[in-house]
Amino acid sequence: GGSAFNVIPDQVTIGGTLRSTNKDTRNDMLKKIKNAAQGACSINNCSVNIEVRPGYPSTINDKKSAKFASTVFENSFGINSLNKEEKPTMTSEDFSYMLQEKPGAYIWLGAGEKSEKLHSAHYDFNDELLPIGAEYWASLAEKILE
């Protein structure tokens, strides 16, 4: 950008994150972004350099593993303690590489309704969750070994 909002800069850098649950959709969106940028440049007598840094693959749970994980949680803490959100959350997570190799489920242990979001500068981990998380992971291990 420029030195002030009303000064046209010599150079502009635009960044962003592109996420989807489908590789083909992601590639199509990237192609459309490139076409739009190149089209805007062609009518404004400027050039564009598009740099794509591949990120993590989509984090997609195995349905059987997700069901197993939720059943263990329900049995440990009750059905009202569980939010079975089924729509994608677009989580960018290195665990996605593990899910490409072995079936599994990425789970979230909520911090409570009054918590700041995880990546907020004001986030404060709720230490009272430690025993709940430990009990859950122990229950998962016990059930998988049965």
Functional labels for PLM-detected ranges:
Residues 1-146:
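Metal-dependent amide/peptide-bond hydrolase catalytic core
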